[in-house]
Amino acid sequence: GSVSVHPKARGEGHMKRLLGDWITDLEGTCDLLALDGQRQRYAYFGFTPGSEKYTFYLDVANVRHTWKNGELSAYTFAPLFPENGEADEEAAAFAKKLNEEKPLYVVREDVKACLKTFGEQAIAIWKNGERIGYLALCGGNQVVEAEVLEEQDFVPALAAYLKENALDSLFISIPVYETGKAAALSEVCESFTKERCGSAMYRIFQFADVIEAMLTMKAETMGISDGTWSAVLEGQPVTVTVKDG
């Protein structure tokens, strides 16, 4: 959701009250809060910028020189949600399953809404007549999310989408811990950047819990060096020990 104040009511403290009440309600039940917003505005409420992602640049020349004529013809595309009640429910269940197979995911109560918010297009990926994945597209050529049943289809499917739609390029964003996707994209794409995920801001209530969760995920996906580290974070003493990471 969003927090908005009418222009005529600015300066009256409404946002401060709303955010303050929200944080008070959640502090006892959450370890971490996340939102998108302007840095200084949310710094007042204890939020700090964070996150990382890779954005790969795939252009038509990369595709032309990597795949010969006909090699991408097995892939076809259609709207993931055909605006048919039963079919939409089945598509949402398919996308939900793929999402929840990722090493780190957010539980989505309404998959269709999540994949169509902020002007996104949800596109189903088909291979030889079988649905194998989906992609979420913004602005015509920005892939903000893409999932497939078999990782070997990830890059060819994106290349096929570029070719089928006569696009000059695609910008493909992935989390840094999805190392298999990153390796496959880096073999084909023209370039990449490493950057923050939009305007992501975070407030941590329980540092030990958040650090344990994040380091566990990193150890499982990217690997981590052994060692011990101690600090006092906003009054919370924390010691981290990694062994056989």
Which residue stretches match the model-derived regions?
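Conserved acetyl-CoA pyrophosphate-binding loop and the N-cap/start of the following alpha-helix
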Residues: 9-21, 153-161
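Active-site/acyl-donor-binding loops of N-acyltransferases
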Residues: 40, 47-66, 152, 156, ...
